[in-house]
């Protein structure tokens, strides 16, 4: 079940809290058995609508959900160890793609710290998964 679909929102687009709340209200009316005048082609339960709203209305939960969705839907070309990437000056890492595009694969330290390890090529549709370990700081 895709939470964006339940609330009739486009997956991956950025929404304000008010837009998510409005979509939630519309979905409640659309899928409520006593309120709906026409039966929609896809029917979700009120519990599914509430769950979708609960996840998407929380910034933290929404980010975790989006990361999980991306990782589940990504069919990556290969797994590449971070040590094979070229470290750039700005805290990013670069790895060339077989398509030859100069953009290649770029991943940042923030991406990796936030468990975003599936990286798309800047020039084609290929993706890779970055294999890495987060170093513990001695604080």
UniProtKB/Swiss-Prot annotation:
Gene inactivation effect: Sensitive to methyl methanesulfonate (MMS, causes DNA breaks) and hydroxyurea (HU, ribonucleotide reductase inhibitor).
Domain (DPH-type MB): residue spans on this chain: 76-133
Compartmental location: Cytoplasm; Nucleus
MF-aspect GO terms: Hsp70 protein binding; metal ion binding
One GO term (biological process): protein histidyl modification to diphthamide
Start and end residues of each J domain: 2-69
Key words, A-Z: Cytoplasm, Iron, Metal-binding, Nucleus, Zinc
Pathway(s) the chain acts in: Protein modification; peptidyl-diphthamide biosynthesis
Residues annotated as binding Zn(2+): 97, 99, 121, 124
CDD domains in the record: DnaJ
GO cellular component terms given for this protein: cytosol; nucleus
Entries under InterPro entries matching the protein: DnaJ_domain, DPH3/4-like, DPH_MB_dom, DPH_MB_sf, J_dom_sf
Protein purpose: Required for the first step of diphthamide biosynthesis, the transfer of 3-amino-3-carboxypropyl from S-adenosyl-L-methionine to a histidine residue. Diphthamide is a post-translational modification of histidine which occurs in elongation factor 2.
Protein name: Diphthamide biosynthesis protein 4
Organism for this UniProt entry: Schizosaccharomyces pombe (strain 972 / ATCC 24843) (Fission yeast)
Higher taxonomy: Eukaryota, Fungi, Dikarya, Ascomycota, Taphrinomycotina
């Amino acid at each position: 079940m895709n939470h964006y679909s339940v609330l009739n929102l486009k997956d991956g687009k950025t929404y304000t809290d008010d837009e998510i709340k409005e979509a939630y209200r519309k979905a409640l009316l659309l899928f409520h058995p006593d309120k709906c005048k026409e039966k929609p082609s896809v029917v979700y339960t009120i519990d599914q609508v509430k769950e979708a709203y609960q996840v998407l209305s929380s910034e933290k939960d929404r980010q975790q959900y989006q990361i999980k969705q991306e990782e589940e839907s990504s069919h990556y070309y290969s797994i590449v160890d971070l040590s094979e990437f070229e470290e750039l000056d700005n805290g990013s890492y670069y790895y060339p793609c077989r398509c030859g595009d100069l953009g290649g694969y770029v991943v940042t330290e923030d991406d990796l710290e936030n468990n975003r390890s599936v990286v798309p090529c800047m020039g084609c549709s290929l993706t890779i998964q970055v294999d890495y370990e987060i170093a513990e700081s001695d604080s």
